[in-house]
A protein has these predicted regions:
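Non-catalytic, conserved peripheral segments adjacent to functional cores
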Residues: 1-107, 123-160
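Asparagine-centered strand-capping/turn motif at beta-strand->loop junctions
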Residues: 119-120
Length: 160
């Protein structure tokens, strides 16, 4: 190999929802990372979690996603609530849905304290997302989860 040219291995994770490439650009991004998810199925919802530190930036390279977003009570009064109990979050929250696709190119910025999740609308959807804090550094303390259906949301595709 030519001197100073290097090859870096990429972490791979797979489950029944998606295949993920984690920390794609490890070098030069010591505090942040870029991940890529290949979503196999349109039948699964991924999510309902928020981060206390991370901001995520989502971009659909191929396919389409229905993205659910909920502003948590903690986001409204962040300074008073350092230790969050997800059971105390008001379930009457308003779920907003955004749609990302390769036909409507945009980046969705998801700040801390916003619950988020998604369902692929097309099999084989590819989501590339940048996070401003490395997952391994903050994941133990940064990730708060509630189950799908917690907010009474409908992940279906409505007939119009």
């Amino acid at each position: 190999m030519i001197p100073h040219v290097k090859r870096h291995l990429i972490k791979f994770h797979e489950d029944d929802r998606a295949q993920r490439l984690q920390d794609v650009y490890q070098v030069g991004m010591q505090n942040s990372q870029i991940n890529i998810s290949y979503v196999n199925s349109t039948e699964h919802c991924v999510g309902w979690h928020y981060h206390t530190k991370q901001t995520e930036y989502w971009f659909v390279v191929k396919g389409a996603l229905k993205v659910g977003l909920v502003k948590s009570d903690v986001q409204m009064d962040e300074k008073k609530n350092k230790d969050v109990d997800p059971d105390k979050v008001v379930q009457a929250a308003c779920v907003e849905f955004e749609y990302l696709s390769d036909k409507n190119l945009q980046v969705l910025e998801i700040p801390p304290y916003v619950y988020h999740g998604y369902r692929a609308l097309i099999p084989g959807t590819i989501l590339m997302y940048y996070i401003n804090e490395k997952y391994e550094k903050v994941s133990k303390y940064d990730d708060e989860r509630v189950p799908i259906g917690y907010f009474g949301e409908d992940w279906g595709t409505p007939n119009k």
